């Protein structure tokens, strides 16, 4: 059993390396098998039915915020002062890894050219994070911690407040030249966000 888990992890590590260097289109099952030092590419299919499934699993294991929202039930009743910084840290810490930065840049370019890549990434990452935030906001409204509002918009608004910080790591370093640290940014944005949604007396 341990050997099976090790082999699976070996494949995921190799796939992450290949996807971050070559993107989804450039990485092949054969090249991933070679990087993983497998005797045959067909061994990958023992663990993953196709390249898309392997890519989804790489995203699952390499994006911290997805691990955070994997078990949403444990978070829904916690106060927003605690949960929103957790989500923000998970999102922003993704881009501290140079390989993850490369993969994100490649995925953005590929998603613009290939709708199927946009769909995979959208369903695996964006839809799940926004879906969690929407459910969380709705629960906080029920608990009286946030005023009634359209949780679809607040979920998008919260993530939107983090995009410049992520963009400074990925594409525009100039944003970070005189900018706050991640902790300073998430503290300020969470405060602004929650002040705007606090219950009205």
What are these regions (language model features)?
Residues 7-16, 32, 58-62, 66, ...:
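Generic hydrophobic, amphipathic alpha-helix propensity
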Residues 82, 93, 97, 101-102, ...:
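Amphipathic alpha-helical packing segments from all-alpha helical-bundle domains
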Residues 119, 137-191, 200-201:
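Hydrophobic/aromatic-rich alpha-helical bundle segments in the mid-to-C-terminal region
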Residues 56-87:
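Amphipathic alpha-helical linker/stalk segments
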Residues 51, 58, 62, 87, ...:
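Hydrophobic/aromatic residues within well-ordered alpha-helical segments
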Residues 61-69, 98, 114, 136, ...:
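A short secondary-structure junction motif
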Residues 1-6, 201:
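N-terminal intrinsically disordered/low-complexity leader segments
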Residues 10, 18-53, 57:
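Helix-turn-helix
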